[in-house]
């Protein structure tokens, strides 16, 4: 694979509307060349015998079964609350906005 040129980097910078100095053109050309070589190397991997997967680990169901269990009654849940009304926790108002009914 041919190395990316300074002119190509300058063109990409113009398209991206990036201000790039002459020194940065050389640096970016080298860095982009390394990245493109790595991408090309990944593309060379033969994966025809590997089945497509959605996960790298072959687990099918790692969640527990849903089980109905007993829970607190409204009275038990509200028993430690400083204030309650209509089976709900009552808290101080924090906004001074009028509530439209």
From Swiss-Prot:
This is Aspartyl/glutamyl-tRNA(Asn/Gln) amidotransferase subunit C. Allows the formation of correctly charged Asn-tRNA(Asn) or Gln-tRNA(Gln) through the transamidation of misacylated Asp-tRNA(Asn) or Glu-tRNA(Gln) in organisms which lack either or both of asparaginyl-tRNA or glutaminyl-tRNA synthetases. The reaction takes place in the presence of glutamine and ATP through an activated phospho-Asp-tRNA(Asn) or phospho-Glu-tRNA(Gln). Belongs to the GatC family. GO terms for biological process: glutaminyl-tRNAGln biosynthesis via transamidation; regulation of translational fidelity; translation. Its EC number is 6.3.5.-. It is an enzyme of class 6 (ligase). One of its GO terms (molecular function) is ATP binding. Keywords: ATP-binding, Ligase, Nucleotide-binding, Protein biosynthesis. The keyword Ligase applies. It comes from Salinispora tropica (strain ATCC BAA-916 / DSM 44818 / JCM 13857 / NBRC 105044 / CNB-440). It catalyses: L-glutamyl-tRNA(Gln) + L-glutamine + ATP + H2O = L-glutaminyl-tRNA(Gln) + L-glutamate + ADP + phosphate + H(+); L-aspartyl-tRNA(Asn) + L-glutamine + ATP + H2O = L-asparaginyl-tRNA(Asn) + L-glutamate + ADP + phosphate + 2 H(+). PANTHER family: GLUTAMYL-TRNA(GLN) AMIDOTRANSFERASE SUBUNIT C, MITOCHONDRIAL (PTHR15004:SF0). The keyword ATP-binding applies. Heterotrimer of A, B and C subunits. It holds the Pfam family GatC.
């Amino acid at each position: 694979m041919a190395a990316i040129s300074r002119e190509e980097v300058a063109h990409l910078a113009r398209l991206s509307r990036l201000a790039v100095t002459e020194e940065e053109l050389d640096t970016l050309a080298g860095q982009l060349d390394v990245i493109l070589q790595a991408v090309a190397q990944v593309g060379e991997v033969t994966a025809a015998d590997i089945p497509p997967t959605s996960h790298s680990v072959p687990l099918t169901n790692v969640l527990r079964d849903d089980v109905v269990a007993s829970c607190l009654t409204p009275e038990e849940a509200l028993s430690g609350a400083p204030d309650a009304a209509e089976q709900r926790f009552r808290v101080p108002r924090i906004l001074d906005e009028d509530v439209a009914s």
